[in-house]
C-alpha cells in the first residue's frame, strides 16, 4: 500500500508518458494485472472501515490517498485521477514490487506475513519488511525522476508512515527506519545518481 503524492500535467493531458510504458511492462510480466478504483469494490470499502476502527481513526485515507495491490490487481485511491505522469510512475514502481512479492510468496503467505509477524498492530515486522522492499523502489524511482534531493526529502514522510497509524504503527522505531532510509540514500549516492 502506498500513499499518493500530488500531481497534474501529462496524466491529465492524455500524453503517453513513462507511467504508461511501465504499465505495458507490468502487463507483460503480470498478464492478469488490472487497475481498479477502490471505491467500486465492497471489499475495499470494508477494509477502509476496518482500518479506521483498528487504528482509532488514524487511518482514514485508505480510499482517498492509499493504493493497494490485492490478488494481483492495483486498487487505486481517489487521488489517482489527479496524479501526474511522474507520480504515477513512482507509484507503479512501488506497487510492482508488491506484485513480485505476491508471485514469490503467494496470496495466503503474503497476507499472513503482512498481517501477523510479529503482531497485526504496533510491531508488524513482516509488514515493515514487505513495505520496506517497496519503499526502496519508491526512493530509487524518485531519485531517478526528480533527483537525489527529492529522494532525500521523502525521509520524514516515510518515517511517519512507519511509526504512525497509516500502516498500524508497523515499526514504531524511528531511528531504525531512518537508518534503513540512510542506507538507501548512501547506495544511490555511491551510484552517482544524476540529477533529472
Task: Explain the meaning of each model-derived region.
Residues 2-74:
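Auxiliary, metal-adjacent structural segments of Zn-dependent hydrolase domains
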Residues 12, 19, 23-29, 112-196:
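Metalloprotease/metallohydrolase-associated module, dominated by Zn2+-dependent proteases
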Residues 40-43, 81-82, 97, 106, ...:
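Short, solvent-exposed loop/turn segments at secondary-structure junctions
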Residues 48-56, 110-120:
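Short hydrophobic helices that act as membrane-entry/anchoring signals
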Residues 64, 71, 86-90, 115-118, ...:
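Alpha-helical hydrophobic/aromatic positions enriched in membrane-embedded helices and signal peptides
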Residues 74-92:
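Short pre-active-site segment immediately N-terminal to the catalytic Zn-binding motif
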Residues 79, 95-114:
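Catalytic Zn2+-binding segment of zinc metalloproteases
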Amino acid at each position: 500500500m502506498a500513499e499518493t503524492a500530488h500531481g497534474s500535467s501529462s496524466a491529465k493531458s492524455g500524453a503517453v508518458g513513462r507511467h504508461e510504458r511501465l504499465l505495458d511492462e507490468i502487463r507483460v510480466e503480470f498478464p492478469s494485472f488490472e487497475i481498479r478504483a477502490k471505491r467500486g469494490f465492497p471489499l475495499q470499502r470494508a477494509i477502509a472501515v476496518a482500518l479506521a476502527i483498528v487504528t482509532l481513526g488514524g487511518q482514514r485515507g485508505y480510499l482517498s490517498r492509499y493504493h493497494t495491490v490485492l490478488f494481483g490487481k492495483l486498487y487505486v485511491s481517489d487521488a489517482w485521477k489527479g496524479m501526474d505522469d511522474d507520480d504515477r510512475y513512482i507509484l507503479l514502481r512501488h506497487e510492482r514490487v508488491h506484485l513480485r512479492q505476491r508471485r514469490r510468496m503467494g496470496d495466503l503467505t503474503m497476507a499472513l506475513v503482512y498481517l501477523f509477524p510479529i503482531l497485526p498492530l504496533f510491531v508488524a515486522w513482516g509488514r515493515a519488511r514487505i513495505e520496506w522492499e517497496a519503499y526502496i523502489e519508491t526512493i530509487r524511482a524518485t531519485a531517478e525522476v526528480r533527483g537525489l534531493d527529492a529522494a532525500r526529502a521523502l525521509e520524514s514522510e516515510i518515517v511517519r508512515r512507519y511509526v504512525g497509524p497509516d500502516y498500524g504503527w508497523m515499526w514504531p522505531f524511528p531511528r531504525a527506519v531512518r537508518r534503513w532510509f540512510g542506507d538507501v540514500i548512501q547506495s544511490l549516492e555511491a551510484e552517482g545518481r544524476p540529477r533529472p
